[in-house]
Amino acid sequence: MANKPLMLMNGGMYHDNLDAVGLYVEKGVEAQKISTKGGWGNFHLLPNGVFWGKDGRLGVTETKTYIKRGIKPDFATQSGPMLVIEGKLHRRFLVDSDSRKIRNGVGISRDGKTIHFAISHRAVTFWEFGTLFRDQLKTPNALFLDGTVSSIQTAGTKRGGWRQIGPIISVSAKRPN
């Protein structure tokens, strides 16, 4: 029996049929292949990346690097753009951008022991959201998960409109052995 989720968050972009736009792996089974195709929209604001887990290890990795490493994850979701890449903000982010949305994302601490999920309280730019991960959360790599439909649910907190959405990240307490 599965543990009750401590947190639920939409976990990446999806098509009208709710399939993930890019890589989606659940319980070691690849449901959607990794995408390296060009296109429009935030997903294709390259570089994009992959949030993944393997044998208790977590990562946020730029897509090309992920492919080169040949990672075979237990779970993964691909989205984009990367917010922070090796400690630097995505090169296409503008400090004075007028594109403001509610945004959510994920980053992993440098030592790999702390995962940070974040959702903005108000509409923010990619620059503002990226600086949260780089400067305050100190994550060397962080990934944008989604914008307009950003949602999170934790004990006592429910933000965003819960409607049918694509990938969902669920975090549960570790099961006792």
Feature map (PLM): residue ranges:
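Gly/Ser/Thr/Pro-rich low-complexity, intrinsically disordered segments
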Residues: 1-177
